[in-house]
Structures are given as structure tokens and as C-alpha cells.
Amino acid sequence: MSDMHSLLVAAILGVVEGLTEFLPVSSTGHMIIVGHLLGFEGDTAKTFEVVIQLGSILAVVVMFWRRLFGLIGIHFGRPLQHEGESKGRLTLIHILLGMIPAVVLGLLFHDAIKSLFNPINVMYALVVGGLLLIAAECLKPKEPRAPGLDDMTYRQAFMIGCFQCLALWPGFSRSGATISGGMLMGVSRYAASEFSFLLAVPMMMGATALDLYKSWGFLTTGDIPMFAVGFITAFVVALVAIKTFLQLIKRISFIPFAIYRFIVAAAVYVVFF
């Protein structure tokens, strides 16, 4: 792969990662399809995907830095105003409770989960995840019990963490699982999305660090320019995607995202089968 071609591939995959990582559409499904079409597969490709995920995570940190600092007791300026009443009740305990179920299962079954990374499993996960989004929209309480982040209870945070375990199934979508779970637990669509983003920071940083440690040997100095382009592209695109998504869900439901997942599942079938 020539230098210019590799940088173009990196930029394309960075855009795909940044656009899809925090939307309920499965970044894994998109990366598998696009990587296959671009002929970028194998151990280097897997390491590259891990690195550009860090770019997406950094975008969340930049977008929610005040809230993240607030969780550890460091406050800047006036209190944050979020969707619903802001009473300053969201704590680090909520985040920890949301992490525990997936962390435990992920550590216990890490190798088994990695073995599920194949097109057919991703295809099925896309469909089931889409059905869950539809179920969440249809079955959610008429009036959310937690309209804002600071109205969430510990129980709701833990149950969202249980739903997050579904995302260990490659292609399911971590944000899709957590947002759907939050809505079914009575958290508003907007607050569930915000909590999903906040929960992503420690969850994805931990998972990415573990994957990077295990795949570091596949990274060479010649890969650095390509990895840097992918990282920066994913960061910039994720910033725009997160901001746009949070504005969009104030006006529309998740049904269009569910339909889109079914289309991507069909695309996986066409490309790989």
C-alpha cells in the first residue's frame, strides 16, 4: 500500500469511526464493511482500529470535560445546565455502577468475545440491536422518570450497565444498548444519550488500552503517519457527530436509526455472503 493510498484509507476509516462510534448504528459493522471494501484487513488493521477509537474517545472528553471533572469533584464556573433539571446529583458512583456488569463479563470472557468478531455475528447483532431500539421507543414510559442526567437513580445506572453487556456482542452498538436500556428504565432519550457518552470514556479507554497492549507488536514506525491521520480524523468527525446527534434526538426518535441498522445488516450479507 503506497503512502498516499494508506493515508487516504486512514482518513476514510477515521471518518467512518468518528461518525458511527457514538451513534446507535454499530461502528464495528461499518468498519468491517469499509475495511473489506478498501482491502485493509489483518493484524495491522485491527491495531489501527484500536488507535482511532482513542480519537473518538478524546472527542467525548472535549465535549463533556466540565461534566467529567464535576464527577470527580472539580467544578468550573456556574453549574452545568442539562436537559431537565440540573441538581448536581449525577456522581462517579452512577458511572461505576454503569461500568461494573460489562467490565466483569468483558474480563471473564475477553477471548471468547474476540472470537465473535466475524461478519455473520455482526449482521445478526445489527438486526437484534435495531429491534431493541424500536422496542425502547415503543415501550418507554410516556413521561420519563429521569428527564435529566441529574435525576438518574443508582438503580437506573446499574440497569443501563446491564444493557451495556449486550454490546459485548460485536455489532450490537454500545451506545444503542445503553441508550435503549436507559429509555426502558425511564430515562429521557436525551439524558440516556448523555449518560451513554459519559459511560463511554472509562469503558472504551479501558477496553482500548487492553487491546492496544495486546496488539502493540503489530505497530511499526512506518505506520505512524497513517495512524496519526486516522486518529485526528476520527477525533474531528466524532466532535461534529456527537454535537449533531444530541441536537437531532431532541426532534426525532430512534426508529430511523433502527431502519438504518437493518440496511447495514443487509449490506453485510451482500458483501460477505
UniProtKB/Swiss-Prot annotation:
Catalytic reactions on record: di-trans,octa-cis-undecaprenyl diphosphate + H2O = di-trans,octa-cis-undecaprenyl phosphate + phosphate + H(+)
Compartment annotation: Cell inner membrane
TM regions (residue ranges): 6-26, 45-65, 90-110, 116-136, 190-210, 222-242, 252-272
Molecular-function annotations in GO: undecaprenyl-diphosphatase activity
Major subcellular location class: membrane
Record flagged with keyword GTP-binding: no
Domain of life: Bacteria
InterPro entries the record matches: UppP
Miscellaneous field: Bacitracin is thought to be involved in the inhibition of peptidoglycan synthesis by sequestering undecaprenyl diphosphate, thereby reducing the pool of lipid carrier available.
NCBIfam families referenced in this protein's UniProt entry, alphabetically: PRK00281.1-1, PRK00281.1-2, PRK00281.1-4, undec_PP_bacA
UniProt name for this protein: Undecaprenyl-diphosphatase
Organism: Escherichia fergusonii (strain ATCC 35469 / DSM 13698 / CCUG 18766 / IAM 14443 / JCM 21226 / LMG 7866 / NBRC 102419 / NCTC 12128 / CDC 0568-73)
